[in-house]
Amino acid sequence: MQNDVRPGIRLLTVCGSLQARSANRAAIAVASSLADARGATIDDFDRLADIPAFNPDRAFEHIAVVEDWRRRVAAADVVLVATPEYAGGVAGAVKNAFDWLVGSGHMYRKPVAVISAGTTGGLHARVAMAQTLTWQGAYLVAELGVAAPRTKSDDDGRFTDGATVTAIASLTELLLDAAATPLADLVDLAGGVVGSLGVDAGRVTPAV
C-alpha cells in the first residue's frame, strides 16, 4: 500500500441504511476520517431515500435527484458502499440507486469497496453487491463484513473495537490506492475478491 494519497482523489460514500443511527454509517465515518487524513476529497451521498423506485420507462427522464446521483458517481474516482442486509439481501434503497445506473456506464472500471455491518456481517448483502457492481463493469477491490456491531461500539454508536477500526482502515487504504492502480492489476484484484464471494470472476471487466 502507498503511504499517502495524492490530494484531490474523489471518494464517494454511500450508506444503504436510512436509519438515523446506523452501524454502516459509523463504518463510513471511520473510513471518511482516514480518507480525509490522506488528502482525499469526500462526497457523501445521503439522498437514497429521495430516489424514486427504478422504472426503465423513466430512465431518460430529467429526475433531479437521479441526475444528481449519476453526476456524483461519474465524478468519483472510487466509491465506498456500506449497506445493511435485510431478509438475506442488500438494502432496497442502495440496490434501487444502483439500478438507476444501469446502462449509464458510470460504474465502468470504477474501483469500489463494500462494507456490511449487521448481526451476521451481511454476507448475502456483500454477495449481492458484488454481483450488481461486477455486472455494471465496476471493480470490487475490497469487501468487509462487520458482525455484531453493537458489541464493538460505544454508547453513541461509534466503533471502538480496535480490530474493527483497523479492518475498515485497511479496506479504505486499499480503495484509495486503487485510484492509481494499473488496470490489469485491478482486474486481478477484483477477480479475487468477487471469486471469494462465489461470484463468477469471469464476469469481471477485462483490461482490454
Question: What does each model-identified segment do?
Answer:
Residues 2-7, 61, 139-208:
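Glycine-rich phosphate/pyrophosphate-binding loop and the adjoining helix
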Residues 39-53, 140-148:
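Short beta-strand elements in bilobed, periplasmic/extracellular small-molecule ligand-binding domains
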Residues 2-39:
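N-terminal beta1-alpha1 ligand-phosphate binding loop
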Residues 24, 28, 66, 94, ...:
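A general structural signal for well-ordered alpha-helical segments in protein cores
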Residues 61-139:
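Helix-loop-strand module that forms the ligand-binding subsite of alpha/beta enzymes
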Residues 46-64, 155-156:
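N-terminal beta-loop-helix "entrance" segment that forms/cooperates
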